[in-house]
Amino acid sequence: MSTRLGELVERLGGRLIGDADIEVVGIAPLNDADASHITFLSNPKFRGQAAQTHAAALILSAADDEVVAADYQGARIVTANPYAYFARAAQFFAALHAHIAPAGIHPSASVDPTAQIAASASIGPFVAVEAGAVIEDGCVIDAGCFIGRDARVGSGTHFYPRVTFLAGCRIGARGIIHSGAVIGADGFGFANEGGVYIKIPQTGAVRIGDDVEIGANTSIDRGALADTVLEDGVKLDNQIQIGHNCHIGAHTAMAGCVGVAGSAIIGKYCTFGGAAMVLGHLTIADHVHISSGSMVSRSIREPGQYTGFYPLAKNAEWEKSAVIVRNLATMREKIRELEKTIKSLGDKPE
């Protein structure tokens, strides 16, 4: 199925230079695109490839257009943010070619009579929906998912096969949860008495906002008393662990294998590189960016980019090293002052 280039620009905006009646079927990389595709240029270092692409149309910035236009023969869509435009165009074509799940409940699904399932929702094979659960308009619940007692799934949300969404958990509209994710398992809560661990019942839930995406095999634990919270627009990659009672601010994104210990509070618009670690009971400000593999061992009160990693050592040795490293800048200034003093003493006549 194809669409006119002019129709695409009418939907997504941008300034079209070229034939609006060109038919395109999708998006392809610069080197692979042919006359049925559009492509995009978001990094100036690929201007040479963009000029030689065989795509029907090229998405690019005004600055890149000034350089590429002389050599590229196809249509051009000029926009302030080519990468964001590419993302929206990709969504458009994905929807154009997507399989539409049929509304209704598969005969093999097990749905409690007290559960509320919207008529437009799609419930796949071998799905289990427990008592009091609510599944709103346009939801797609793929094969083998489990939705627990009194859980709520917001409109337009898609659960891929084998998602586990346990009792009392909530997710807002337009969410995506990928296969193998477990939402609402017990948090890791125990009291120690005489060397024996006593389990603390985890009676909170998980509360997730709108437009949240959760990757495959990611686990988000329910709160001990209050809820674990993910605000609107949070994006979690695969195999992430979010401990109980954490609060993740809106539009924060985490790459694969990030671990966040219980009761951490993370601000809005933060990013975490792969395998970053956050210790429990910390607070991280808005607009903080943590590099891959870093360990956050203290609260961060100011926005910015943070990086930190030490080799494994005995804890006492590690703490001493951390203090030394943290004070290196001050020590350097003191050494400079000492060098100046020594030099001035050496310059004095005997």
From Swiss-Prot:
**Keyword terms of this UniProt record:** Acyltransferase, Lipid A biosynthesis, Lipid biosynthesis, Lipid metabolism, Repeat, Transferase
Q: Which CDD domains match?
A: LbH_LpxD (cd03352)
Keyword Transmembrane helix assigned to the entry: answer is: no
Give the EC number(s) listed in the UniProt record.
2.3.1.191
Q: Which one of the record's GO molecular function terms can you name?
A: N-acyltransferase activity
Record keyword Lipid metabolism present: yes
Active-site residues per Swiss-Prot or TrEMBL entry: 244
Catalytic activity annotated for this protein? a UDP-3-O-[(3R)-3-hydroxyacyl]-alpha-D-glucosamine + a (3R)-hydroxyacyl-[ACP] = a UDP-2-N,3-O-bis[(3R)-3-hydroxyacyl]-alpha-D-glucosamine + holo-[ACP] + H(+)
From which residue to which does any coiled coil extend? none
Family annotation (PANTHER family): UDP-3-O-ACYLGLUCOSAMINE N-ACYLTRANSFERASE, UDP-3-O-ACYLGLUCOSAMINE N-ACYLTRANSFERASE 1, MITOCHONDRIAL-RELATED
**What is this protein's function per UniProt?**
Catalyzes the N-acylation of UDP-3-O-acylglucosamine using 3-hydroxyacyl-ACP as the acyl donor. Is involved in the biosynthesis of lipid A, a phosphorylated glycolipid that anchors the lipopolysaccharide to the outer membrane of the cell.
Give the record's subunit note.
Homotrimer.
Family recorded in the similarity comment: Belongs to the transferase hexapeptide repeat family. LpxD subfamily.
Q: What's the protein called, per UniProt?
A: UDP-3-O-acylglucosamine N-acyltransferase
Lineage, broadest ranks: Bacteria, Pseudomonadati, Pseudomonadota, Betaproteobacteria, Burkholderiales
